[in-house]
Amino acid sequence: MIIIHTVYCVLGRTGSGKSTVTKEAAKQLNMSVLRSYSTRQYLRQGETKENSDHILISPDEVEKYRNDMIAYTDRVGYCNFATKQQLLDNDFYIINPTGYYELKLKTKDMDIELVTIMVNVPFSELRKRAKKR
């Protein structure tokens, strides 16, 4: 199989700095970060619809993307997903481990290489960061 596209999948716990690290790397390397779809209806402190890591949609809109979904995660009260086209159009994808597993399964016959980057932060630091959110 000839690889036609490489996607750097960034994984880590909430608050580990995945978005910060990924956005800076993408900026320095002139690469793009995939903004996955999310039915999460709240914005975090300092977040707007424009600067969010996600494209915020209503639960009613999910079905129209169903045939093109490549990584779907059902969270507590909302879901996140990306489409095949988004994957092909971007270089980095910030994704949780459950979504990454599905992504691996659904891309095994595609000419895409997935490179995993884990962002690890001590639990004590995660706790501090969570209190600031």
Please provide the spans of the model-predicted regions.
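P-loop (Walker A) phosphate-binding loop of NTP-binding proteins
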Residues: 13
